[in-house]
Amino acid sequence: MANPYHHAVSSARKWGGEPNDYIEIHEWFDETKAHFGDFRHRALRHHTEGIWLMQSIFGRTITNSAGRVIPTRWIGEQHVTEDLGRLVTVQDWLSCMEPQPWMNRSRRLSRELERETAGVS
């Protein structure tokens, strides 16, 4: 499924209510497409940590238009499973990333700050 609306339709079929009851959550998962246009956008939120983050933003439950209380984690798990076939972790994504030299070029800020403060009385 490529479109948040289709995920929302799937949620409505599964738990009742209308697609609009679910669309904001599904749009949140897929809004990273604005920054990276292919499937790799999913590495930012389509994992178990992303589901927990979504819950902290949208709350533990929503009440759909049919009056049913739905755990938001269920909605997140549905979205990720529909896109990836299973729930994955951040480790699943990052372990597939090939490290590049620029990723590990941190500055020694502690030394720089020590030198700066040593010269100041």
Q: Model regions: which residues?
A:
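N-terminal membrane-targeting hydrophobic helices
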Residues: 1-121
